UniProtKB/Swiss-Prot annotation:
Annotated function: Is required not only for elongation of protein synthesis but also for the initiation of all mRNA translation through initiator tRNA(fMet) aminoacylation.
Protein name: Methionine--tRNA ligase
Phylogenetic placement of the source organism: Bacteria, Pseudomonadati, Pseudomonadota, Gammaproteobacteria, Pseudomonadales
Motif ('KMSKS' region): 331-335
EC number: 6.1.1.10
Compartments where found: Cytoplasm
Entry-linked InterPro entries: aa-tRNA-synth_I_CS, Anticodon_Met, Met-tRNA-synth_bsu_C, Met-tRNA_ligase_1, Met-tRNA_synth, Methionyl/Leucyl_tRNA_Synth, MetRS_core, MetRS_Zn
Gene Ontology cellular component annotations, sorted alphabetically: cytosol
Membership in a protein family: Belongs to the class-I aminoacyl-tRNA synthetase family. MetG type 1 subfamily.
Source species of the chain: Stutzerimonas stutzeri (strain A1501) (Pseudomonas stutzeri)
A Pfam cross-reference name: tRNA-synt_1g
Length: 679
């Protein structure tokens, strides 16, 4: 047997400013399954995480609730911990970035970077809220767009016309926090010299640590030239003060990944057999894996390895990136009841249903995963209840009734048993490669073979034939052994089902190596149902409860939906003014990200006999722009072209919604054709 590996695994830190939802759970379930597989194989695999507990958002929410930030993050951590535990996510340690360990490590890494010449300082001019006494990030500044005069726009981007600009260009700026008129003020900021590590990053990102598509994306940033990274924020700020710099704080993304190290260090204090340096020193032979979403790859594949390199620590073995979660083919929606909190799900359904469904769809890539609720019900009921559990329920009764619960020593179908044995290495390889979907397909193919064999032998019919009872016992003994095999293969995904099966099988906790053995002359415990089918009514109840979550979280609204109160009707215009706007149907032929733009997508539009290029500020609502391709939309064709730093924008597309994730691109009814005029 090969020597046990030493592995440290992390998931991205959940922000301590709200509840966990099913989109978050995708990552933690994915990570937990991989960790459980490693432990099942006998490796030393340690899984740590923490709440990301710093930043202005937490400070402001705590102020709004009339509590301290410390009280807020303690309350949220208790909620997060309960949700994770009930979803069977088994951290070895779940800590907080607001901890003595994280402060100590953040200061250590910063001072090492500073002393090595990797920190720069310079003056930055920013808007300052004189009423709150704080500098304002772009998202905390609102005003009138300098391009289209739309009101209530953010400090760097107009969500109506798609323009990007500097906060100082915004007309009638105001603080989104206090409503006060901000003033420009200079402040000393601290920058991490990321370009110092460009050569190292080019080599590391192409060295096998990243999925190919992620490495390709990072290469775009590297080829475009790296910029120094602003790592400081001014007081008031909830976080750690920079050593020797009163009133200056580490930006939340500086100390957040250090939280991985801090959580592990905290665990080391409670488990003296663990050594911090054995996992984090530059000479470490241990493996280090980060599981993250595709929205934060720049922090984990550029800033983080550069910080570690500059401070004399080891870099990650690999960073595993996953896509976003959609529900029923669309973004999670509060109004549709598909923005489902972890606790709302747990109030209605077994967590292992979702663990299995996620596993069945999680491959090696970074594609988005769709939770189709009809498919979810069908797959769980068919695979887990109809295939896996069905084998045990078919066979257990005959063994109890015919042989007092004792499995006979028999293998009446050596070829089938050998097929299960032969599949084990491939299933293990799929788990190791984090290709859970392939592992589930191979496991269910085995379950199909076992069920087909039992159906062909029909022990229920043989049991009625005199003299066939011994054959029935042999068939059912092998059936239970095949069930035991499937339980071993599924144990990383379904730990509760495995524990219940171990109780029925009357065995100690199963390890991966147990798949090579047959139970013989072995007494079983009484069989009880191991998993029940999903009732569609429970899905409906969960959706309704999610809508109620939304209603409960919103203050009472006036009659109607309140949209006119948010955006009053504009001044009346005559028909000629309206007719001057040339609205056309446009086919989106291509939709893509704009490098360097936080909120823009580049759309190539077919308007019948011509194509147009448009930049639109809808990125936040459409994280996978390729899904817009082939869709019809409404296009303002005679708007004067506008030169932007990313290129020329030739008109604009129409969308509704308040902004952020709630932007809804308008589409015509069926039958409309590109180029047709909208009247």
């Amino acid at each position: 047997m090969s020597e046990a590996r030493q592995i440290l695994v992390t998931s991205a830190l959940p922000y301590a400013n709200g509840s966990i939802h099913l989109g978050h759970m995708l990552e933690y379930i994915q990570t937990d399954m991989w960790v459980r597989f490693q432990k099942l194989r006998g490796n030393q695999c340690i899984y740590v995480c923490a709440d990301d507990a710093h930043g202005s958002a937490i400070m402001l929410r705590a102020e709004k609730e009339g509590i301290t930030p410390e009280q807020l993050i303690a309350n949220v951590q208790a909620e997060h911990s309960a949700d994770f535990a009930d979803f069977l996510v088994n951290f070895d340690n779940f800590h907080s970035t607001h901890s003595p360990e994280n402060r100590e490590l953040a200061e250590l890494i910063y001072t090492r970077l500073r002393d090595a010449g990797h920190i720069a300082t310079r003056s930055v001019t920013q808007y300052f809220d004189p009423e709150k006494g704080m500098f304002l990030a772009d998202r905390f500044i609102k005003g009138t767009c300098p391009r289209c005069a739309a009101e209530d726009q953010y400090g760097d981007n107009c969500e109506k016309c798609g323009a990007t600009y500097e906060p100082t260009e915004l007309k009638d700026p105001r603080s989104a926090i206090s409503g006060a008129t901000p003033v420009l003020k200079d402040s000393k900021h601290f920058f991490f010299k990321l370009p110092d590590f460009e050569a190292m990053l080019k080599e590391w990102t192409r060295g096998g640590a990243l999925q190919e598509s992620v490495a390709n994306k990072i290469a775009e940033w590297l080829d475009g030239g790296l910029q120094e990274w602003d790592i400081s924020r001014d007081a008031p700020y909830f976080g750690f003060e920079i050593p020797g710099e009163p009133g200056k704080y580490f930006y939340v993304w500086l100390d957040a990944p250090i939280g991985y190290m801090a959580s592990f260090q905290n665990l080391c204090k409670r488990r003296p057999e663990l050594s911090f340096d054995a996992f984090w020193s530059k000479e470490s032979s241990a493996e280090l894996y980060h599981f993250i979403g595709k929205d934060i790859i720049n922090f984990h594949t550029l800033f983080w390895p550069a910080m570690l390199e500059g401070a004399g620590f080891r870099k990650p073995t690999a960073v595993n990136v996953h896509g976003y979660l959609t529900v029923n083919g669309q973004k999670m929606s509060k109004s549709r009841g598909t923005f489902i909190k972890a606790r709302t799900y747990l109030d209605h359904l077994n967590p292992e249903y979702l663990r299995y469904y996620y596993a069945s769809k999680l491959g090696r890539g970074v594609d988005d995963l769709d939770l189709n609720l009809d498919d979810f019900v069908q797959k769980v009921n068919s695979d887990l209840v109809g295939k896996v559990v069905n084998i045990a329920s078919r066979c257990a009764g005959f063994i109890h009734k015919g042989n007092d619960g004792v499995m006979v020593e028999a293998n009446p179908e050596p070829e089938l048993w050998a097929a299960f044995q032969a599949a084990a290495p491939s299933i293990a390889d799929a788990y190791e490669a984090r290709d859970f979907a392939r592992a589930m397909r191979e496991i269910m193919a085995l379950a199909d073979r076992a069920n087909a064999w039992i159906a062909d032998k029909a022990p229920w019919a043989l049991n009625k034939v005199e003299g066939k009872q011994a054959e029935v016992q042999e068939i059912c003994a092998l059936g239970v052994n095949l069930f035991r095999q499937l339980v071993i293969f599924l144990k990383p995904v379904l730990p509760n089902l495995a524990a219940a099966a171990e109780q029925f099988l009357n065995v100690a906790p199963l390890s991966w190596d147990d798949h090579a053995t047959l139970l013989a002359n072995h007494k079983l415990n009484a069989f009880t149902p191991l998993m029940t089918r999903i009732e569609p009514a429970k899905i409906d109840a969960m959706i309704e409860a999610s809508k109620e979550d939304l209603a409960a979280s919103e203050a009472a609204v006036p009659a109607g939906n309140g949209e006119l109160a948010k955006a009053p009707l504009a001044a009346e215009i005559n028909f000629d003014t309206f007719a001057a706007v040339d609205l056309r149907i446009a086919l989106i032929e291509k939709a893509e990200f704009v490098e360097g733009a936080d909120k823009l997508l580049r759309l190539t539009l077919n308007i019948g006999d011509a194509t147009r290029n448009v930049f639109s500020g809808i990125k936040s609502a459409y994280p996978d722009p390729s899904k817009l391709e082939g869709r019809l939309t409404l296009y303002v064709a005679n708007l004067a072209p506008r030169k932007m730093k990313f290129g020329m924008s030739e008109g604009m597309v129409l969308a509704a919604g308040p902004g952020g994730s709630e932007i809804y691109l308008l589409s015509p009814d069926n039958g409309a054709k590109p180029g047709q005029r909208v009247m």
